[in-house]
């Protein structure tokens, strides 16, 4: 019997990469998986209904760190550090109990997501020492950089320096390390002197993320309206999209743009909101002018109606929801919704474009949401930062922007069309040419560059070996994996 514990100190349902790892591990011969994390939202049915996967839910800390004493700042100054210590101790005790008592023997490997790094990596090292098992760290980002962002502190602040030391010291002796970007691997191996095997393992979409036929899209959008109680103008916009699936070039087109956000500081939603307002103001005015021009000139510019669907949960959602509600939009609508896990891939497949506002705290991670969008062959507009070029290739599968002005320009480029006698003219600015070309590129990549094909490179890490030759073979796989990632990147470039 081979048993792997997959640990994420976060919501399992909102941790797609760790769910995909669990699914892949469950397919290994004679292997059982114990998935440990918070069960705040329901994991995918392929996790819940899998006989080879057992979920061990963690209990959240009973006091909210973000809301406690918010209205009493003076008390917050003294109580927040005490609460933070209590929360870490609560997590340590719970993780130790689950991994030392509830997870049965034999346990061969622990695969842990980082961040959060504290207390996760520290606890995992202790458990691995006690139980004599391998630790594999799946690096999504750097924990201390997220802490620095949330506390608005500098690198030299004592808390940030301590967090960085703990993360580096307890991580460096892990059996193996997985990195979401090549830049992350280079930086951590060089600066933190990591000892274990290293693999660049770019995020890949699960098979549940795929394209849908026009008919399947129509059926899902009708279900979406009823299931999520979409009413009023929002419903009218979606019904217009449904009509577009069967009627080519209607006089007034509507497109769906989706953005999945955590509503946190490293995803500045105001950039998208400002771009929407600029697009709306510009084309609401132009729409009135066009009515006059149509009587004098048969050639005018048609701006599509845009329906923005924003998914996700997070601390700033209420703040931006109030801003959205105060807007009086003419050419656009904004819906905020929290989707069931099985509905999210289907909605992505129904959209015309995705937007990513993820701006990395470390500069060396990549947004999983873009990977999922690409899985559904959905082109993406992404905010520009250091490593995003490892994922988004300009003019191939998306575009990059730095601010709301550039995002507004891209929306104009993709969703405004010259018309002649109220019929859209095929020009290079036509969305039907630009986005369709990108969809074809993504479809081609999707056929070969899959989660399953990439996961084969790290598979040896989770198969028990009793000889040094097996270990040597795994090291060889590590080298070939890294070169494979580089070759794959070169081909895409």
UniProtKB/Swiss-Prot annotation:
The chain crosses the membrane at residues 72-92. It is found in: Endoplasmic reticulum membrane. GO terms for molecular function: chitobiosyldiphosphodolichol beta-mannosyltransferase activity; mannosyltransferase activity. It is a single-pass membrane protein. GO terms for biological process: dolichol-linked oligosaccharide biosynthetic process; protein glycosylation. InterPro entries: ALG1-like, Glyco_trans_1. It comes from the Eukaryota. This is Chitobiosyldiphosphodolichol beta-mannosyltransferase. It comes from Dictyostelium discoideum.
């Amino acid at each position: 019997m081979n048993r792997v514990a997959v640990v994420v100190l976060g919501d399992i349902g909102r941790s797609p990469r760790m769910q995909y790892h669990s699914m892949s591990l469950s397919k290994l011969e004679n292997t059982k998986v114990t998935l440990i994390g918070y069960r705040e939202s329901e994991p995918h049915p392929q996790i819940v209904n899998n006989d080879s996967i057992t979920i061990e839910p963690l209990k959240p800390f009973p006091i909210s760190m973000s809301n406690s004493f918010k209205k009493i700042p003076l008390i917050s100054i003294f109580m927040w550090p005490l609460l933070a210590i209590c929360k870490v101790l609560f997590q340590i005790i719970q993780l130790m109990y689950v991994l030392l008592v509830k997870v049965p023997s034999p346990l061969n490997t622990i695969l842990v997501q980082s961040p959060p790094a504290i207390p996760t990596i520290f606890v995992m090292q202790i458990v691995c020492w006690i139980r004599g098992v391998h630790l594999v760290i799946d690096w999504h980002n750097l924990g201390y950089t997220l802490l620095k962002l949330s506390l608005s502190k500098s690198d030299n602040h004592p808390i940030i320096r301590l967090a960085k030391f703990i993360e580096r010291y307890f991580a460096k002796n892990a059996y193996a390390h997985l990195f979401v970007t090549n830049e992350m691997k280079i930086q951590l191996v060089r600066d933190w002197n990591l000892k274990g095997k290293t693999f660049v393992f770019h995020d890949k979409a699960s098979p549940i993320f795929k394209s849908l036929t026009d008919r399947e899209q129509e059926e899902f959008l009708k279900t979406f309206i009823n299931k999520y109680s979409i009413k009023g103008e929002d419903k009218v916009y979606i019904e217009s999209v449904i009509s577009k699936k069967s009627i080519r070039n209607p006089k007034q087109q509507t497109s769906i743009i989706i953005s999945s956000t955590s509503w946190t500081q490293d995803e500045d939603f105001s950039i998208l909101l400002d771009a929407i307002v600029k697009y709306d103001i510009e084309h609401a005015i132009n729409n009135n002018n066009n009515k006059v021009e149509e009587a004098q000139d048969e050639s005018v510019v048609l701006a599509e109606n845009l329906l923005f669907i924003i998914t996700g949960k997070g601390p700033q959602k209420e703040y931006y929801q109030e801003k959205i509600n105060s807007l009086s939009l003419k050419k656009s609508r904004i819906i905020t919704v929290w989707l069931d896990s099985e509905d999210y891939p289907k909605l992505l497949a129904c959209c015309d474009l995705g937007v990513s506002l993820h701006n990395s705290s470390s500069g060396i991670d990549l947004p999983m949401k873009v990977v999922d969008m690409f899985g559904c062959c959905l082109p993406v507009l992404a905010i520009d930062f250091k490593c995003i070029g490892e994922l988004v290739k300009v003019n191939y599968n998306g575009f990059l922007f730095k601010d709301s002005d550039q995002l507004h320009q891209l929306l104009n480029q993709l969703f405004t069309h010259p018309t002649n006698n109220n019929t859209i003219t095929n020009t290079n600015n036509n969305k039907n040419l630009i986005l369709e070309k990108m969809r074809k590129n993504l479809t081609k990549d999707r056929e070969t560059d899959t989660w399953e094909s990439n996961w084969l490179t790290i598979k040896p890490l989770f198969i028990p070996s009793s000889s040094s030759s097996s270990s040597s073979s795994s090291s060889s796989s590590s080298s070939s994996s890294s070169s494979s990632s580089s070759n794959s990147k070169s081909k895409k470039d």
